[in-house]
Amino acid sequence: MRPEIAVLDIQGQYRVYTGFYRADAAENTIILINGSLATTASFAQTVRNLHPQFNVVLFDQPYAGKSKPHNRQERFISKETEAHILLELIEHFQADHVMSFSWGGASTLLALAHQPRGVKKAVVSSFSPVINEPMRDYLDRGCQYLAACDRYQVGNLVNDTIGKHLPSLFKRFNYRHVSSLDSHEYAQMHFHINEVLQHDLERALDGARNIDIPVLFINGDRDEYTTVEDARQFSKHVGRSHFSVIRDAGHFLDMENKTACEDTRSVMLGFLKPTMREPRHRYQPVKQGQHALAI
């Protein structure tokens, strides 16, 4: 299962690497938004859960993954800017749904507050409107280690906290990935944490009141950092909010064990299953060999 690769130009400012997993029988397209320090590779299991029921789009932020070589890392990118990048991708791929993981939820809620045309439903996983004590400790220590560019501590911090329930093999992959990131990625994450601690989450929640589509919030019952109880407070901000709990799962949900993977897939498909609607033009890529450049 190989994606159709395109590097898209976003308003002449950023180049964004995208992978489009086409399913010929699918009528709906979903865009996946990853969390901090993550890349398109983090969504391998989620793609298997959603494809071929849906066309699936993955992308890397301009400062991360396969988008990095296409951008000059001259300035930090705010969550608001990430939201506008997402809006451009929604329009380009004519997406019906979006799904975010962890802190990708902040830019997703900011984007949905603009009520993008064509988006029918959203899934927000492992995210919370509350920065509780475990999460605050995680962010505070992360800020300290990122500022010092302490790769050993950053790698261990992720595995010892939000990744504590991952299988050992995934922890090794996690450590190798997180501890080998470029210094500008550490600086970008440091910037994001400060945004969150100062005002960014509050801004996302204020904007969430404008969201007019159904949003499903999924959390694991073993997740101490974005808890089931805290996530339910989204009902105060998102009018058409729905909630699902994945049993015996922590922050990383479908990556943690087979049962959690099956339950997460069942919950997602149950919420997103296509309904009868008017036919719409299906996305066709710009054909320029393996890589496409679209405005």
From Swiss-Prot:
It is an enzyme of class 2 (transferase). Keywords: Transferase. Pathway: Polyester biosynthesis; polyhydroxyalkanoate biosynthesis. Its EC number is 2.4.1.-. Residues 28-254 form the AB hydrolase-1 domain. InterPro entries: AB_hydrolase_1, AB_hydrolase_fold, Carboxylesterase_BioH. SUPFAM superfamilies: alpha/beta-Hydrolases (SSF53474). This is (R)-3-hydroxydecanoyl-ACP:CoA transacylase. The gene is phaG.
